[in-house]
């Protein structure tokens, strides 16, 4: 089972949820609060090989990019996948 950590207000926090598989794709889930969780979908850009991490909040019901999440929440959150 894979885990990940994320940065919140300068503090490194370990994931509170495990990994789930939906439609054959990995979904990394983290719980940020009692009623707020994020689904993180790692995707790769074929042309460059760069990893793009998408975040889906159960509050917004839409997939956003990290900078969109930071703008929406007013906090800096960075997610780091650990193999």
What residue ranges belong to the model's regions?
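Short loop/turn positions at the edges of beta-strands in beta-sheet-rich folds
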Residues: 22, 32-34
